[in-house]
Each structure stands twice: as structure tokens, then as C-alpha cells.
Amino acid sequence: HAFCLEQREDLKWPASMYLEGSDQHRGWFHSSLLESSGTRGKAPYESVLTHGFVVDGRGRKMSKSLGNVISPDDILKKYGVDILRLWVVASDYYDDLKLDNAILQSQAESYRRIRNTFRFLIGNLNDFTKEEAIDESEFPELEKYLLHRLWEVDQVVQKCVSTFNFHLMFTTLLNFCSSDLSAFYFDIRKDTIYCDSKESVQRRSTRTLLNIIFNHLVRWF
């Protein structure tokens, strides 16, 4: 902190957060706190966030002797960078982060569900304009219920972001996409979208809500 934060005008001291592995409780976190408190009378950070270490699917340390090391390059070649990112955000970093091919395959399935949710939304919002939108007060009961569920999810997401609980945030969003949307709302309103007239209140309400959901999901993800 003395050679970085205090020497650069574009950075502030104390740091808003120190982020490191659990081994740094007696290392960097501790030594920085002692030095800064002794020379400046104040901690060099406002908060500390600790994460676990990457281990294999059985919770063992990765090593060449065990033959359980998974190279990031191999993951990128087989699954792509988005699956690796998804694994990171879906992992509960308060504990060690388990990683193997079965876990990555599970995240690939989660990615497929999220992608299909966006595909449905984009495909059924073609040519949607603000003139077609209908006031939320005129929504049918089903749309009002989904609007309430959207609000509930947003409350969880905001709290998770402020507390860095990305694991719960991702689980909440995945369940919302899979259960509330794909398995429930989308399935019910398919006939409305495909069969009702463009001027019908129910179809306009459905498309208005789909637009609201889409904009929320884009911000959340």
C-alpha cells in the first residue's frame, strides 16, 4: 500500500478491499495491518475478502503426482471462456473451489439453460416498440405475479452484489431462468405469443413483460 496506493494519484488510500487466499490471514493481511497501524495509526484497507483454493472434484490438492491437474488452456479449448467464467461465479469461494470435468459439464448445462432463455426472449421481442408496450397496471394476474417475482429476484441480486455473495446470486438467477421462466411462464404464454392477435391486451402484456425481463437479465448477467 505504501508503494502503490500512496504513490499514485489515481488510487486512494486506504484500499477499499484486500482480496487474497486464506493463507494470507497470517501473511499479507496481517503484515500490512501491523505496518500500517504502527506507522499511520490506521488499517490500510476498509475490508478483507478471503477465498479458498482450487482443488479437484474430490477436494484434493491438485498435483502432478496425483495426475489431477486441469490446465486452464485445456478448459478453454474444450468448453470456452464463458464456461470457465460461469464456474468461477457459481463457486462458493468461502470454501475451496472444486474443479473437474463433471463439474465443468454441469456448468456447460447451466450455460445452455441461460442461453436458451435469452434466445426465447430475443426471438419473441422481434419488432417490439414502446408503442406496443402496455402499462403494468393493466397486466393480467400472471404477468403481475411474474413482475413481483422479478422484484424479489432483484432484491436478492442487489444484496448479493453488496455482500460479494456471487454464488447465491448465480443460483438465484439460474433458478429464475429455469423454473420461473422456461418451465413456467414461457410454457404458458407460448400460445399467446404465437396465436393471439398483435393488438390483444394479453399478447401486448406478455411482450411488454418479456422486454422488462430481458433488460433485467442483461443487467444482472
PLM segments and residue spans:
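Structured secondary-structure scaffolds
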Residues: 1-127, 146-189, 193-194, 209-219
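Short His/Asp/Glu-rich catalytic/ion-coordination signatures at enzyme active sites or charged loops
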Residues: 133-143, 153-158
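Acidic, serine/threonine/proline-rich low-complexity intrinsically disordered regions
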Residues: 198-199
